[in-house]
């Protein structure tokens, strides 16, 4: 797992958040209840809302992300709004060159849950991080990872960009974790 801080410029981070704020109430969102394999929802009670990023935003994000991402042939970038009770069960993203998470919340308290937990290759222990603004976590080694459920007392959504690099642009899967 690679952890990189301050990935986006302030201008790009602001544009990404502004687009989200303008579209948060739109009828353009889908749900992890519909999109994700049921095995990924074990131990969670809430739903994660998912929306693709528009091309104009991808055109801004990709040049900055490419400075730190592994090489790929195609990429998907989606907003995820992790609601209370939402999380994702242990999985490895092994169908992709990499899976990555970019955290968009300005602040996130450890008691809100939504911790990113992973097991490094060849280790018996698990590690965890608290979401931090503009931090990117890249899984390019198919390491098992999960997100703990967001607390029912969380005062905000856990907001991320989920990014998947693929080998074949013709692969039209939804790029939601399998």
For the regions a language model picked out, list residue spans one by one:
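Non-heme Fe(II)/2-oxoglutarate
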Residues: 1-69
């Amino acid at each position: 797992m690679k952890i990189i801080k301050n990935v986006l410029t302030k201008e790009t981070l602001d544009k990404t958040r502004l687009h989200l704020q303008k579209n948060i109430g739109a009828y353009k969102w889908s749900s992890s209840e519909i999109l994700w394999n049921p095995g990924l929802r074990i131990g969670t009670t809430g739903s994660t809302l998912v929306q693709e990023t528009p091309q104009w935003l991808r055109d801004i994000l990709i040049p900055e992300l490419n400075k730190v991402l592994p090489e790929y042939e195609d990429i998907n970038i989606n907003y995820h709004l992790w609601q209370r009770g939402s999380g994702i069960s242990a999985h490895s993203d092994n169908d992709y060159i990499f899976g990555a998470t970019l955290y968009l919340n300005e602040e996130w308290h450890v008691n809100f849950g939504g911790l990113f937990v992973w097991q490094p290759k060849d280790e018996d222990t698990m590690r965890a991080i608290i979401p931090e603004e503009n931090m990117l976590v890249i899984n390019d080694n198919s390491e098992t990872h999960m997100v703990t459920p967001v607390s029912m007392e969380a005062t905000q959504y856990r907001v991320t960009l989920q990014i998947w690099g693929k080998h074949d642009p013709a692969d039209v899967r939804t790029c939601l974790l399998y």
